From Swiss-Prot:
Xref: Pfam families: BRCT, DNA_ligase_aden, DNA_ligase_OB, DNA_ligase_ZBD, HHH_2, HHH_5, Nlig-Ia
Residues the record lists as binding NAD(+): D30, S31, E32, Y33, D34, S79, L80, E112, R135, E172, K289, K313
Annotated ranges, domain BRCT: 590-667
Name the record gives this protein: DNA ligase
Binding site for Zn(2+): C407, C410, C425, C431
Transmembrane intervals: none
Cofactor requirement: Mg(2+); Mn(2+)
Catalytic activity, as annotated: NAD(+) + (deoxyribonucleotide)n-3'-hydroxyl + 5'-phospho-(deoxyribonucleotide)m = (deoxyribonucleotide)n+m + AMP + beta-nicotinamide D-nucleotide
GO MF annotation terms: DNA binding; DNA ligase (NAD+) activity; metal ion binding
Keyword Manganese tagged: yes
SMART domains: BRCT (SM00292), HhH1 (SM00278), LIGANc (SM00532)
Name of the gene: ligA
EC number(s) on file: 6.5.1.2
Amino acid sequence: MIKQQIEELRQLLRHHEYQYHVLDNPQIPDSEYDRLFHQLKALEQQYPEYASENSPTQRVGAKPLSNFAQVKHDIPMLSLDNAFSDEDFFAFVKRIQDRLIHVHHSLTFCCEPKLDGLAVSILYINGQLVQAATRGDGTTGEDITANIRTIRNIPLQLLTDNPPTRLEVRGEVFMSQAGFEKLNKTALAKGEKTFANPRNAAAGSLRQLDPKITGQRPLMLNAYGIGIAEGVELPDTHFARLQWLKSIGIPVNNEIQLCHGIEKVLDFYRTIKQKRSSLGYDIDGTVLKINDIDLQQQLGFISKAPRWAIAYKFPAQEELTILNNVEFQVGRTGAITPVAKLEPVFVAGVTVSNATLHNGDEIARLDIAIGDTVIVRRAGDVIPQIIGVLHERRPENAKSIIFPTNCPVCDSVISKIEGEAVARCTGGLICAAQRKEALKHFVSRKAMDIDGIGAKLIEQLVERELVHTPADLFKLDQVTLMRLERMGAKSAENALASLAKAKKTTLARFIFALGIREVGETTALNLATHFKTLEAFENATFEQLQKVQDVGEVVAKRIRSFWSEPHNVAVVKDLIAQGIHWDNVEVKEVRDNPLKGKTVVLTGTLTKMGRSEAKEYLLQLGCKVSGSVSSKTDFVIAGESAGSKLTKATELGINILSENEFLALLA
């Protein structure tokens, strides 16, 4: 009897939460909801044997965390490409039409406001909320389950009698403008720090280690899509899927529309742009998605984004300010970037005091001088940049901006390759500015993987002039390391052990670690597999380099430029002298095998070897390794938790190999 009463109260409260938070249709006064809530809470305290973690009373109350655990996304949470004009949008549509030449009807889009919040993934197992994570880098996020459970419009249990066995909801967590203003008002009254804008407030609230604090913040969710779905037959359009989510208790934005044809899509964009200030929450554009799921799957993905969706951003907010000075920064590859030092100005929710001027060509194009009144905007509402100059306001004491001829850090000559806008320092690894970033790249996980040497340690080593080249890292001793801040005997021992371990590597990792421009992890692997030895790679001609898979004229020029610098050659020789070595890449003719000459895609997690090792084996089998599935793909090797690539391969009828079947080919 009591158990039934408790469950009925829970169902009643869930119903009213859904009516209030999702449908915006409250059916009872807040006071009545509070009465029911406290009645349930009292019964649960009196009868703890009937407690449930998914009860409406359990949204707040988990213990504070010491840190956030990592969560790997089974299906990557990709970002979106951007459009900033009608022309950009038309180009996006043309790319779609070029790929869908068999589709003769006009395209239908699901159009949504682009909320300015944080992307999250929420996993339901048999209808129960079991895990939530941030987007993170798209592959791995942070576990924020306890905090997500405190958000009132997110159901802890799906409102359906027949829930999917597994459902991953993806959406945006945000804060309304009214909630933001109230939060800041309360903070001011308490003498606490305020937030600059609703997005920062939402981010700070969602990443609180104490869920009780998150529970006091006015956060909301709007779902925009589905990741994993098992035990359910989903509708075949994006719009219908969002409506289905809404029917089972997941909040969806009320402004979403189905638009048939390009003009209707542009009408939606213009309408939302006009309504922007009256929506009650921050948006920075619209998201435009092909509605038909089958067409989405045919279009597929590029490396970081779907081909079937685009974010059409609103024009960035702009303000006037004064250019006080220009400083020239040096990046890891020697790129010289002019940075405008501005009179601080509030733009799009943040105070801007620096802005990029990109390069010397941009300075000339703008005809900008120190002392000018300039128009600054946050491109995409993120990166501040100067887009114009009010020349009529130029003061008499304005000073011309002189692009340096020598590096501001090491005084080496600055050069500019014909056809490139970027000027670069020629100092290579003798330039301290490049040195820090080059060393950080050298020790990184995908390069030499020296986990005992972190970014802060490298900064100390460079600033104290203890390390000038990567080879100097291997000359460090315990006494030297212990003189550095926060380096005791144990830390020094760990660092030296990491360095010793890193001396055994692979040719591919070593090439990648050198930081040659345009030579990424995959290209380094292709180079190592093709040339077999460092000597052959070093002496390869421009023409020989272009015979390597994925190496064109530009990459070949970068490689030859690297080896033509005596300083770089000296550093490489020193590294070898310090004991860097690797197993020989066997020079043997590719034996006949089912994968020879085929295009292969890896997906999922391999349990018996790393992804890089698997790529290396595939190249040795004479394969071309691709990062995406298409009609040109011959085989897909599927490890654990294989996601969208496996799904697409199945739909296209592509041959799929398990990890064990792949290993059998290597035997």
